[in-house]
Amino acid sequence: FTGIGRRLEELGTINGITVIDDYANHPTAFKANLQAVKEKYPERRIWAVIEPHTFSRPKATLSDYPAAFRLAHQVIISKIFASRETDPGNFTGADIAAATPRARYIPEFSDIATYFKQHAQPGDVILVMGSGDSHKLSRQILSTL
């Protein structure tokens, strides 16, 4: 038994950079995951990457995002995974980034992977969280490093 997939699942380490994938999809879980990863890797920079789940949930919990990501070196926010919702056209990942210190909105997965190729350093930990397609992003980052 090696653990449960998508729950702080360490996918691998390439060039000294560790990529972790998790199913978390709300600020309480983001914060708990960052605390756990920081406990395991106290001296390493931790990058948090989220694929927000639905439009309504992050909009309703927007005020919780700054505290949730307090332990992150930087936060990368992708486009929102709509799931069962229709895009209302008045809320995006850019709104989350604007409300979150040290956050950057990079909507496309391929651009996020390229960003890490250029900015991640040996010793860094990249924690990717979301319940939509973020598992694909985790693997894309790992293969791009």
What role is predicted for each listed range?
Residues 1-145:
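ATP-dependent carboxylate-amine ligase
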